[in-house]
């Protein structure tokens, strides 16, 4: 079994071979080839292919190739100016991820401390928060309306509590490995290709989820749909056009949206950003 990783010009960046054991008639054998990613890349971010060729006595028995996206760790590290003051209410160890990305932040124990005017934060991040009181929701809306910027990371319960007129619920997808951009021109996607919000890697043998949930949201001039996810295998039965539209809407949801309120903005994300230390797009 010969393997190679090649760039878009078919230049070999890394390669190797593995001996494949004999397979009995109608049998099956598995091996785990020792594939090394290239130590040097021609650019910070590169589209490559993993090519596999199985030969016996010089005769090719099988060939396969797989598209991959690889990047240097420096590509998305240190992208936030150190002078920006970022506060983090951390309920799911997001501080570790931000440290990896070299994003300086200060953790706080509560929403009240997060919104303390004396902190003069440029951005408030709420990560992994599942419970939010009515008073905390009111304080968050008040803070945002005065010009505050808030980022909700995998805090769907809290986000719905804060924005009940916009976020009506959520779905835990059975197929959460592919996310699609709704606004390709949004600055949040700078440096990311249109088809790259998928198959987020965490070096584990499991479905490579790109999102944890899809949000059901009302269309409104204050809501900007940035990215979404929908079931990719389903039957759309007959009926009136409006019935089919409703059926399609029931199978899709948002994974990234921005909400305007007064002078401020809030971004709500259900993307698997915790994979930033193993997936370059998740980190970006």
Where are the language model's segments positioned?
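Short hydrophobic alpha-helix segments
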Residues: 9, 16-18, 64
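Solvent-exposed serine/threonine-rich low-complexity stretches and specific carbohydrate-binding patches
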Residues: 13-25
């Amino acid at each position: 079994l010969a393997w190679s990783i090649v760039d878009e010009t078919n230049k070999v960046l890394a390669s190797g071979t593995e001996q494949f054991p004999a397979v009995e008639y109608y049998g099956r054998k598995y091996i785990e080839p020792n594939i090394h990613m290239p130590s040097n890349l021609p650019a910070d971010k590169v589209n490559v292919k993993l090519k596999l060729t199985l030969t016996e006595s010089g005769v090719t028995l099988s060939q396969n190739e797989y598209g991959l996206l690889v990047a240097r760790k420096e590509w998305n590290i240190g992208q936030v100016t150190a002078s920006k003051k970022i506060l983090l209410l951390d309920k799911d160890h997001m501080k570790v991820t931000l440290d990896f990305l070299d994003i300086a932040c200060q953790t706080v124990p509560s929403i009240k401390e997060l919104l303390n005017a004396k902190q003069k934060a440029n951005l408030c991040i709420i990560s992994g928060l599942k419970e939010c009181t009515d008073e905390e929701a009111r304080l968050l809306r008040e803070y945002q309306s005065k010009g505050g910027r808030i980022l909700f990371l995998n805090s769907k319960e809290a986000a719905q509590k804060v924005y009940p007129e916009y976020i009506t619920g959520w779905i835990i997808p059975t197929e959460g490995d592919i996310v699609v951009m709704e606004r390709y021109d949004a600055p949040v996607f700078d440096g990311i290709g249109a088809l790259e919000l998928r198959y987020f890697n965490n070096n584990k043998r499991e479905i490579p989820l790109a999102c944890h949930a899809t949000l059901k949201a009302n269309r409104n001039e204050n809501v900007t749909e940035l990215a979404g996810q929908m079931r990719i295998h389903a039957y759309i039965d007959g009926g009136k056009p409006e019935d089919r539209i409703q059926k399609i809407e029931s199978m899709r949801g948002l994974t990234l949206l921005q909400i305007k309120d007064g002078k401020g903005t809030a971004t709500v994300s259900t993307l698997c950003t915790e994979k930033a230390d193993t997936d370059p797009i998740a980190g970006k």
